[in-house]
């Protein structure tokens, strides 16, 4: 009840007392009761109107607000229903019991927000990490690294898998394994996070930015054909927001031009293309386990391939280029791109419930689709939701909605409305071609 100390007063109390209470609680409102029974909510705005009218604030609240109706909800009301009632006008709602006694209150700030992604750490994460700490295996050597790699490849039917320190280092490692260097060109989509293009630049090669397909937001196979040159060495296809690229067409381009295909699956763990998990189509594929990804290790990544030579080279490069049979003897100029045993312990625990996490994301997306479909025609004609494809099972890393017309004002209004309702939203990635540092790689 301490939280209600500066919020509740009786209808017999003066308006001046209510004003003092509102100034003290900083919430812009207070709750009015009659013999402990909830009556109404009055705001600083209500009192301001009385001041303008030069009313006597020493009179009781009952004199002015006896007929004012206030919103109150039962203490057991689900949060989603409370969110629906909160707005710019109704910023605070008292929560009452069956006898209309005030027990608590809700505001947008004290309700749990609906985040873009909430990490599920309710499995064996704590137990496995504790095991690492108890046994002192906290660096890049330890049983959990191999256990995580094995669990990952078996679940998604990958032949070979190698943990890395991040999704970005996995991409850079892939380019190094394929011997991509200065003078080579690597094709990359225009709409993506910067990791792929940065990895290409760090490899010394030239990125070639290619436009996207308007329906999927993934790299457009027809546009790739226009950008292929004698110097093209590889394509990095990014399965954006959980939607798979047109892999059938990409594989045709790869075969015809004798180039490599790297799948960036950072946002598409669990996505399927023609019955197979993405990551099974490229020469090398990479994943990210950053904190907002479908499964997480805090920071971390994975490189997968079916090519034993690529795998062996990646493993050496990942550990400083050191000969695995002759310690401290370096065969290659390598990197420290290893994942720690601690991170892998979290990853293993995450993989134990990967199926549940993926299914839940798809269920939530289906719910969004169902509810959006019920909107009136005028609204639906202004937006584009993720496009269904019979060949693809979208894992919906992030559910996305695009406004058809270029209307930044409407976009910002929607984001602001979501924020008021306690729902976290964000804009799409910026096109690479719009950023000064990458502009020269786009025609």
Residue ranges of predicted features:
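Phosphate-binding glycine-rich loop
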Residues: 143-185, 199-203, 209-211, 276
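PLP-dependent aminotransferase class I/II
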Residues: 148-150, 159, 222, 226, ...
């Amino acid at each position: 009840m301490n939280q209600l100390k500066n919020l509740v007063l009786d209808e017999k109390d003066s308006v001046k007392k209510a004003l003092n209470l509102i100034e003290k609680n900083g919430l812009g409102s207070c709750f009015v009761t009659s013999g402990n029974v909830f009556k109404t909510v009055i705001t600083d705005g209500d009192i301001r109107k009385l001041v303008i009218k030069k009313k006597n604030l020493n009179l009781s609240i009952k004199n002015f607000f006896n007929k004012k109706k206030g919103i109150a909800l039962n203490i057991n009301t689900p949060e989603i229903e409370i969110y629906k009632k909160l707005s710019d006008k109704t910023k605070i709602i008292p929560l009452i019991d069956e006898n209309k006694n005030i027990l608590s209150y809700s505001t947008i700030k004290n309700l749990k927000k609906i985040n873009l992604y909430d990490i599920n750490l309710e499995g064996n994460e704590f137990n496995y990490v504790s095991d690492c700490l108890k046994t002192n295996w906290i660096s890049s050597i330890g049983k959990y690294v191999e256990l995580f790699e094995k669990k990952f490849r078996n679940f998604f039917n990958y032949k070979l898998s190698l943990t890395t320190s991040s999704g970005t280092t996995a991409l850079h490692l892939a380019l190094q394994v394929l011997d991509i260097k200065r003078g080579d060109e690597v094709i990359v989509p225009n709409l993506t996070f910067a990791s792929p293009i940065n990895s290409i630049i760090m490899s010394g090669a030239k990125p070639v930015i290619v436009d996207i397909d308007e329906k999927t937001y993934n790299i457009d196979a027809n546009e790739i054909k226009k950008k292929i040159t004698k110097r093209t060495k590889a394509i990095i296809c990014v399965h954006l927001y959980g939607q798979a690229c047109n892999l059938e067409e990409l594989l045709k381009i790869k075969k015809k031009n004798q180039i490599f295909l790297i799948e960036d699956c950072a946002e598409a763990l669990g996505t399927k293309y023609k019955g197979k998990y993405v990551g099974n189509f490229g020469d090398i594929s990479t994943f990210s386990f950053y904190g907002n990804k479908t499964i997480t290790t805090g920071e971390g990544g994975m490189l997968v391939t079916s090519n034993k030579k690529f795998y062996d080279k990646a493993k050496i490069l990942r550990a400083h280029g050191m000969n695995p049979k002759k310690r401290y003897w370096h065969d290659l100029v390598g990197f420290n791109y290893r994942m720690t045993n601690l991170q892998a312990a979290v990853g293993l625990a995450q993989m134990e419930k990967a199926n549940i996490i993926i299914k839940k994301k798809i269920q939530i997306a289906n719910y969004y689709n169902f509810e959006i479909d019920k909107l009136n025609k005028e609204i639906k004609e202004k937006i584009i939701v993720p496009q269904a494809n019979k060949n693809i099972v979208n894992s919906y890393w992030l559910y996305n909605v695009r406004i058809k017309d270029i209307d930044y004002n409407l976009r910002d209004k929607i984001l602001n409305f979501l924020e008021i309702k306690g729902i976290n939203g964000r804009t799409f990635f910026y096109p690479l071609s719009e950023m000064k540092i990458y502009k020269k790689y786009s025609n």
